[in-house]
Amino acid sequence: MGFFSSIFGTPQTSEEGKFDTLRDDGVRAMQMGELPYAEKCLKAALELRDDDKTKAFLAEVYLHMNQYDAALPLLEVLCAAHPDDKELNLLWAQTLGKLEKWEKQRDVCAALLKTDATEARALYLSAQAEKGLGDYLTAIVHLTQCTTLRPDFHSARLLRAQVLEAMGQWNEVLADTEALVETNPENEEYQFSHARALSHVGREDEAIQQFEAVLQLNPFNREAILCLGRLYESTSRRDKALKLYTEAIDLMPDFAEAYKARGGVKHQLKDDAGAAEDLKRSLELAPE
């Protein structure tokens, strides 16, 4: 190749070189967290050449950006071209779940399970879709299979607890949340789910301790504050409820529900003026 050819290349080489440069720059940008630039490079590369590997990189960028609706059509095309690629199809199913496309997610998982009935991730994602569709019994079956195959699949155990909660099966919920808290006592979501289960089976003192532990981990957990406050009130600890709501309002002055709850406690304590003021503030923050 002559000197000028080595610089400028033939038109074909130039086109190929541009594609490679854009793709490689896009991948490097993705790895560095420069996601908008990565998207720009990879889209430009695909305008030059239809390439599955580049589509996969672009889909990955969109997933990192939480742009699931943009990733989905790319994954659909890739899975149609590579129907036997298990990891790709699992990613497709997961993305469908992010977009709450439950029926399609269930269908994709059914195809995966037909190929491998012991694929725990497909069982989990199928159960996620079944929960979304209200098919709780099938979801429980799949999640039980999943946790039997992989006892350390904590997301599956948590999802089963959530499905059982939707069914009102609180004793069964408690069994799962106890196991989760044992595996990771510092996990806020596990602690919160366990506290809710304890409160629903009538173990109020333990539930109070558990909600207090949640707030030790995260004092900004609004739902935990309201649940704990209701427990304080139901066990005649109105002074603690009042203190809890006041501290929450100090931390989060826009916490309308805390104003409303504190107003209710003040009313029970015969502080009608204070109750009216809190209710007014609650309505200002969140008009009903």
Where are these regions (language model features)?
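Alpha-helical segment of the N-proximal tetratricopeptide repeat
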Residues: E15-E47, D51, F57-E60, H64, ...
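Helix-start (N-cap) detector for alpha-helical repeat units in TPR-like alpha-solenoids
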Residues: F19, D52-K53, K86-E87, A120-R121, ...
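Canonical positions in the second alpha-helix
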Residues: A44-A45, V77-L78, A111-L112, Q145-C146, ...
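Short coil turns that delineate tetratricopeptide repeat
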Residues: R49-D50, P83, A117, P151, ...
